[in-house]
Each structure stands twice: as structure tokens, then as C-alpha cells.
UniProtKB/Swiss-Prot annotation:
Major location (coarse): nucleus
Protein name, as recorded: ELF3-like protein 2
GO CC annotations on file: nucleus
Keywords per UniProt: Flowering, Nucleus, Transcription, Transcription regulation
Keyword Transcription: yes
Composition skew (Polar residues), residue ranges: 211-222, 294-306, 314-330, 501-523, 688-724
Described purpose of this protein according to its UniProt entry: Involved in the regulation of flowering time.
Reported induction: Circadian-regulation. Expression increases after midnight, peaks just at dawn and gradually decreases during the daytime.
Gene Ontology biological-process entries: flower development; regulation of photoperiodism, flowering
Length: 742
């Protein structure tokens, strides 16, 4: 039997008035009916104990709950229950109304009160001789002795089980926060109320219970210093314990004050368990003493030997009794040890202020309403489970936010480095190389040069006065359909508009036969610049600069060379690169095809070095290249570039004349050429003429001597909208600005 009492007689008598208790705690009482339930063993059940009236201190079981909850709670409950008739409204949820008459209270004055003094002193760090009258409690009836039994058993069980369950002291209950408020007024008004103990109502409530809980920790340091004084008074007052209940009751209150403050301070600091190691008298050491006293009382059957000698009681802190001295050696410490412990606790109070409330259970939320909001209060309000869940969520969000901020700062740093040193990236880029080093002035100079021309023989030269008119008419008319490409150029245009000979129209190249197979358009290697359109799965259409005599055949769509016989793009890069820096023309004539069918496949390309932006641009350019009858593919050419065309009859030369100031900016769909400048007297781009007999134009090639540079100019509007990367766009813009300034 644990914490149940001193002997078997008490157990038998107690079983008569009490119901079954928890079997583990009270095996002999398990079969008996009636009485409250067993004390809880966890914190949730402990909280339930404080909210259910039937779970209040009743027998050893209820007292054990107090011991598991906190030592201060049990001590204060016992002491104040003794003073206020055992059932105060301070324990409103837990009171079991008592019907004890004045006779039972009078019994308590002489014997039970003295035991209560000893139990209170024991909880405050002093030796106790509590078990003196254990038998007397069991001898009475339940109606007479129920309050006293609850008080006594609460003290004994809290002392007997405290060492075994000392790990639960870190979770004090609401009483550890409430009772210091009452303790602050005990010195003033409680002792006056303690004298007429018999007249007190069992349900009288102390007025100081509802005071601000901030006094819980303010009076700890003051009361700790008075512990020794009150202990000396209480020990000295044991001499007069037989004189009357009034004087002993005052001692009870003094002891209650000191003992509760000591135990409250123990719960106010988490360092209470360290005190036994430091050599100071600690509350946790006292259960050993009381257990030894219980055993001694049970064996000897008398407790007078521990209480009667007053001299031993006065010197008990310095020299304990032999029976107790054998059990616990910590009691040999002087009284200054407890004061030293109080000094250390006061020194640690400022550091552990936040940790004090952390040890409170969920039932103590009402005691901290007047304090400032702190995480510990939130724990008490929403519970530890919800608090830690919310805390984990907040920490995760902060971690994600920190990672995002880190990435943002890294991106900003990279952008600043790119903006500060673009030349480093340009030098390390093999694709760029020197592609962006040519200036606009150089580009303009190259554009001023005439395009390659196809010169016909003198026999084909006919009156050229009709060329402007024909050019104008062809420019204003809508472009013919694809099926009218070759026949219209050879037949319809000559019959209806020109009126020239229909049988002598054919192209006769002036170039020698050994140059027939050479390209009519030749590029100058050192000055060619190309922006290769590449489709990227992530960025879409991207331009990659390329510097060389000609665009790479494998990675670029062929540029268009207008006003020229459609040329076939070589299938391999080797043929392309070995064709004297030009676009090779197949040896056989390129037939335009029958009407109604496309005369130019996708691998054909006409005029003025415009890279294909996308397949749509290629289709539009091919559509324009299907009309070899000159400006018909560009019906609105005059509108864009103010270009006038002079077309020659079968014996003449078809020429393009453009003003020097006219330029057509390259774009993906509107204009298929970059910057076209043709002089009236300069060489003209090669253009085939159709024969009247077969109406099949033959490709003709110009001379290399008449060919000049064709440079791919980087369009500014496209370079600004390219989306390959911000660094590449920035580098291009910076280089162009530097070139403009120079």
C-alpha cells in the first residue's frame, strides 16, 4: 500500500467510510463500494481532476493526484483546508461538502492540527513528524472525520509519493500559481481568522484567491527568507501545541505560509531538482524523511517520540532525530542552506521567467490573464499540440521564404555583374566572337554598292522606254497567282501590255560558258555577318550570331535573293562551302513548273540576303519568288521603298533602279530584303527572261567581276525582342551603342 497510511488498522477503518480506490494504490480497498475515483496518472487526467468535483482530494488516491500534480498544491490544499474547514471554494470544482460537526473540528485542534504543522513544515524543507495521530483519523466516522482525513491523506500521499514522481514537478497545476496570492495575505488577515476555527464554515472562501497572479512570483524572494524564521516559530510552537487549538492553528498558518512559498518557489524554478545536489535542503528530500517517519510510526505504533521532545524540534534542522538521520543525510545541513538556495533561486528568477509559465498545465490559463502575452500563454490557451503544430508551420514558411530571398539576391547579383562587365561574357562566347564588331557605317557603305546583274546580249536589247511604264503597271497590279508565274511573264505580259515580239524573248547571258555554272550572286567573305534563327524549345525563336563568308547550310534557312532565278540550296555543307563563297546554281536549268503547281520548292530562295524568321516567312518569300516577271512578287514594293523598275524587252536588260535614300528594313513577313540600293547606271541583279517558244525561263548567271558584298545587317527591332537571354540582348545593345558613339 503506497501513500495510504501508517498501518493496517487505519486501512481497515478507512475502508468502512470510503469507496473503492485505485487497486494499484489501495489493494485492500478495491472491493469496497463508494467513494471517488482514483487519481489520474497523466496530465490530461490531472486536468480532468480539477474540473470534476468527484475527483477532489478524498483518501490516499486523491492525495496521490496532488502529489503527482505538485507538492505545493497538496500542501496548500491540506493547510488551507485545515484552516477553512477543508472544503473551501478555492477548490470549487473539487469540493466534497463536509458535514463534520464542531466536535470533529475540535478533535483536529489538538492532534490533527499538530500533524498538519509537521506535514506543512516537511513540504517547506523541514523535518516532519506528521504521522503522530494517523490512527485517530481512522477511528472517527465519515461524517465526522472526512475533512480531516482528506487533509491528512493529502499530506501523507504527497510526501510519500513525491520522490517517486518527482519528474512530474515540472508541470505544476493552477494551485502553484494561485496560492501565493493567498499567501501574501496570510501574514495580515489569515491568522486573525484562524483562531475561531470551530466557527468557520466548511465552504468559506478566502478573498485573496482571485487576486492578480503577478503576486505569485513577486513574493517568492521575500517569503523564502522568512521560511527559516517561520520554521523556527513552528518548531518552537510545538511546545505549546497541547495548550489550545488557537495557538497551534496560528502555527499551522505560519507553516502553511512558509511551506507553500517554498514549494511554490520550487515550481517557479526548474532548478529545484538541482538543490539536493548542491547540498541545500530541498523539498524533494523530504519524502524520504516522511516515509521513514511513516515506517517508524507503523512499527512503533506511536508518534509521540517524534513530536513530544521540543528541544529536538528546535534543533531539528541542524541535528535530526536518529531514525530520520539514518534515512536521509541531507537534513544535517544548517538553516543557512535554505536561505542560500533562496538566493540562488532569486538570481535565476529573471532568467527563467519565461520558463516558469511554460511548466504550467492547461488548467492554469486563467491565472495568467493579467500578464503580457507570451508564447507560454499561447501554449496554455491553445494547447501544446496546436502550438507546436503552428510553430512548425511558421518555421517551414520562414525557411522557404529565406530560400526565396537567397535566390532573389543571387539573381540580382548575377544581373549586376552582367550589366557591369558585358565584355567578359562576349570574350568567352565562341558564338559571338567578332560578330558584333562591325559598325553601322560600314554596313551602310556596303549597302551602297550595286547588286549583281545579269547582262544580256546586244541582240536582246530592245527599246527600253517602255520599261518604266511596264514597271509601274506591274507594281500597281496585284501579284498574279502561282499558276500565272512563268506563262504570264513570258506571254501575258508581252502580249497585252508590252506588245513586243513574242518569239524572240529569251535570256542570253553575256558571261562566258565557263562561268555559266557559277553563282550570279557572290559574297565577300570577310564582311558577311549572319544571325542564325534557331528554334529553341524553351525560348522559341532565337537568333545566334555567326560570322563567316556564308551562312551555315545546316543550321539556317537560306536567305532570299530576289530578282534572280530560283536557286537550290545545297544539301550538304561541303558543296555550299566549296562554291566560291556563293550559292551554287545547278548545272541544269531550273524550270518554273506548269501553271497551277508551285514553281519553287521550299529549298529555293530568291533575293537580297534576308534570313527566314520562321516557316511563315519562308512561305511568303517563296510565294514572292514564284514570279520571275520581276516586280510582280512585290506588288507594293513602290509603297515601301519607292523603287522604280526598268524592264527590258527581249533584247534588253531588266534593271532595278532605286533611290539612294530608299531602304527597306528587313522583317519576318512584310519585306523580304534587308537594305536594297540599286543604282540606275550600276549593275543590275540577275533576272531571267522567258522565251516565247517554250515559255520556260533559263537561269542565267552574272559575272564575278560585277558582284559585290552582301552583308546581313542585324535588325535592331528583332535584336531587342529576341528572348534567348537577357545577357545576350544586353551585350548586343551595348556593343551597338559603343559603335554608334565611335
Amino acid at each position: 500500500m503506497r501513500g495510504g497510511g501508517g498501518g493496517g488498522k487505519e486501512v481497515e477503518e478507512r475502508g468502512k467510510v470510503m469507496g473503492p480506490l485505485f487497486p494499484r494504490l489501495h489493494v485492500n480497498d478495491a472491493a469496497k463500494g463508494g467513494g471517488p475515483r482514483a487519481p489520474p496518472r497523466n496530465k490530461m487526467a490531472l486536468y480532468e481532476q480539477f474540473t470534476v468535483p468527484s475527483h477532489r482530494f478524498s483518501g490516499g488516491g486523491g492525495a496521490l493526484a496532488s502529489a503527482r500534480g505538485s507538492l505545493a498544491r497538496s500542501t496548500s490544499a491540506a493547510s488551507q483546508s485545515q484552516v477553512y474547514g477543508c472544503d473551501m471554494p478555492l477548490f470549487e470544482p473539487f469540493n466534497v461538502p463536509s458535514n463534520g460537526p464542531g466536535q470533529s473540528v475540535e478533535k483536529m485542534n489538538s492532534n490533527s492540527v499538530n500533524r498538519q504543522i509537521n506535514g506543512s513544515r516537511k513540504d517547506s524543507g523541514m523535518l516532519s513528524t506528521q504521522p503522530k495521530g494517523i490512527d485517530k483519523y481512522g477511528s472517527g466516522s465519515r461524517a465526522e472525520c472526512a475533512p480531516q482525513q482528506r487533509v491528512e491523506k493529502g499530506i501523507k500521499s504527497s510526501s510519500g509519493r513525491k520522490l517517486a514522481d518527482d519528474d512530474e514537478f515540472i508541470v505544476p497545476s493552477v494551485f502553484s500559481a494561485r496560492f501565493p496570492q493567498y499567501s501574501t495575505k496570510e501574514r495580515a488577515g489569515v491568522q486573525e481568522e484562524s483562531t475561531p476555527l470551530v466557527a468557520l464554515s466548511p465552504h468559506k472562501s478566502p478573498p485573496a484567491v482571485s487576486k492578480s497572479p503577478t503576486k505569485c512570483y513577486n513574493t517568492v524572494s521575500k517569503n523564502l527568507e522568512r521560511i527559516n524564521v517561520s520554521d523556527v516559530k513552528s518548531r518552537g510552537s510545538q511546545k505549546d501545541k497541547e495548550t489550545g487549538p488557537a495557538q497551534t492553528l496560528k502555527n499551522v498558518e505560519v507553516e502553511h505560509f512558509s511551506s507553500f512559498e517554498a514549494s511554490k518557489d520550487m515550481f517557479g524554478s526548474k532548478h529545484a531538482k538541482v538543490c539536493p545536489k548542491t547540498g541545500t535542503i530541498n523539498d524533494l528530500d523530504e519524502p524520504h524523511l516522511e516515509n521513514s517517519e511513516h515506517q517508524a510510526t507503523s512499527r512503533n505504533g506511536s508518534s509521540v517520540k517524534f513530536q513530544n521532545p521540543p528541544v529536538r524540534r528546535n534543533t531539528i534542522s541542524a541535528k535530526p532525530s536518529p531514525g530520520i538521520e539514518n534515512t536521509n543525510g541531507h537534513c544535517n545541513l544548517p538553516q543557512g542552506g535554505l536561505k542560500e538556495a533562496g538566493t540562488k533561486r532569486k538570481r535565476l528568477e529573471a532568467q527563467d521567467n519565461a520558463e516558469k509559465i511554460d511548466d504550467l498545465s492547461d488548467s492554469s490559463v486563467e491565472c495568467i490573464t493579467a500578464w503580457e502575452i507570451s508564447p507560454d500563454e499561447i501554449v496554455g490557451a491553445i494547447g501544446a499540440k496546436h502550438f507546436w503544430k503552428a510553430r512548425r508551420a511558421i518555421i517551414n514558411q520562414q525557411r522557404v521564404f529565406a530560400a526565396q530571398v537567397f535566390e532573389l539576391h543571387k539573381l540580382v547579383k548575377v544581373q549586376k555583374l552582367i550589366a557591369a562587365s558585358p565584355h567578359v561574357l562576349i570574350e568567352g562566347d565562341p558564338c559571338l566572337g567578332n560578330a558584333l564588331l562591325a559598325s553601322k557605317k560600314k554596313m551602310a557603305e556596303e549597302n551602297l554598292k550595286a547588286q549583281p546583274v545579269l547582262v544580256a546580249t546586244n541582240d536582246d536589247v530592245q527599246p527600253s522606254l517602255q520599261e518604266p511604264e511596264l514597271s509601274k503597271e506591274n507594281s500597281e497590279e496585284n501579284p498574279p497567282s502561282p499558276r500565272d508565274t512563268a506563262p504570264v511573264s513570258g506571254h501575258h505580259d508581252q502580249t497585252a501590255k508590252i506588245g513586243a515580239s513574242k518569239s524572240n524573248l529569251r535570256a542570253t547571258p553575256v558571261a562566258s560558258d565557263n562561268r555559266q555554272n557559277n553563282c550570279g550572286v557572290q559574297l565577300q567573305p570577310p564582311q558577311n555577318q549572319w544571325l542564325i534563327p534557331v528554334m529553341s524549345p524553351s525560348e522559341g525563336l532565337v537568333y545566334k550570331p555567326y560570322s563567316g563568308p556564308c551562312p551555315p547550310a545546316g543550321s539556317i534557312l537560306a536567305p532570299f535573293y530576289a530578282n534572280c532565278t530560283p536557286l537550290r540550296l545545297p544539301s550538304t555543307t561541303g558543296d555550299f562551302m566549296n562554291s566560291a563563297y556563293g550559292v551554287p546554281i545547278p548545272h541544269q536549268p531550273q524550270h518554273m513548273g506548269a501553271p497551277g503547281t508551285p514553281t519553287m520548292p521550299m529549298n529555293y530562295f530568291p533575293p537580297f540576303s534576308v534570313p527566314v524568321m520562321n516557316p511563315v516567312a519562308l512561305a511568303s518569300a517563296v510565294e514572292q519568288g514564284r514570279h520571275p516577271s520581276m516586280p510582280q512578287p512585290y506588288g507594293n514594293l513602290e509603297q515601301h521603298s519607292r523603287m522604280s523598275c526598268n524592264m527590258s524587252h527581249p533584247s534588253g536588260i531588266w534593271r532595278f533602279h532605286a533611290s539612294r535614300d530608299s531602304e527597306a528594313q528587313a522583317s519576318s513577313a512584310s519585306s523580304p530584303f534587308d537594305r536594297l540600293q540599286c543604282g540606275g547606271s550600276g549593275p543590275v541583279s540577275a533576272f531571267p527572261t522567258a522565251s516565247a517558244q517554250n515559255t520556260q525561263p533559263q537561269p542565267s548567271s552574272g559575272s564575278r567581276d560585277n558582284q559585290t558584298n552582301v552583308i546581313r545587317v542585324i535588325p535592331h527591332n528583332n535584336s531587342q525582342t529576341a528572348s534567348e537571354s537577357a545577357a545576350r540582348i544586353f551585350r548586343s545593345i551595348q556593343m551597338e551603342r559603343q559603335q554608334d558613339d565611335s
